[in-house]
């Protein structure tokens, strides 16, 4: 089980690095990226699986050398949930008091792209934070 936890941990690092880079580049270029959203969801699934495996290891009396490993292991899930909450409010913040249906089609499209860009930026930053936390978790594990 510890080996699986290590392998999934490496996947968490790789997937969040890829999502962070992909989302950051797409955000910078001001172009929506379908590829980013698939990477993001895979990274989030890996984080969830990693936390579950870590919980199983705790319940089977495996302990890391450093107790900070628990904090660095759980925080990525917390960051992911907070980022999803922030993403959910991105459309509301972008729209403000504007009546979307009353806007002309080209303005609707521009506003929709602005919402997607804001959501992508929020989630890309969260992947960067999770990447940092996962690297710290790896550094406090017994595997290294």
Q: Which ranges hold each PLM region?
A:
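Juxtamembrane boundary at the C-terminal end of a transmembrane helix
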Residues: 132-144
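Alpha-helical transmembrane-segment detector that highlights a single hydrophobic TM helix
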Residues: 56-92
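Membrane-interface helix-boundary motifs at transmembrane edges
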Residues: 28-37
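Hydrophobic transmembrane alpha-helical segments in integral membrane proteins
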Residues: 1-17
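Individual transmembrane alpha-helices with interfacial aromatic-anchor signatures
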Residues: 71, 111-129, 136
């Amino acid at each position: 089980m510890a080996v699986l936890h290590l392998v999934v941990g490496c996947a968490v690092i790789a997937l969040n690095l890829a999502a962070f880079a992909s989302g950051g580049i797409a955000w910078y270029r001001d172009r929506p990226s379908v590829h980013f959203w698939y990477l993001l969801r895979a990274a989030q699934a890996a984080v969830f699986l990693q936390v579950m495996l870590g919980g199983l290891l705790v319940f089977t009396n495996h302990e890391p050398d450093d107790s900070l490993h628990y904090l660095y292991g759980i925080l990525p899930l917390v960051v992911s949930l907070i980022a999803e909450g922030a993403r959910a409010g991105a459309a509301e913040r972008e729209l403000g008091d504007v009546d979307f249906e009353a806007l002309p089609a080209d303005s609707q499209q521009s506003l929709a792209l602005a919402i997607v860009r804001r959501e992508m930026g929020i989630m890309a930053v969260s992947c960067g934070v999770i990447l940092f936390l996962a690297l710290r978790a790896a550094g406090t594990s017994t595997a290294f």
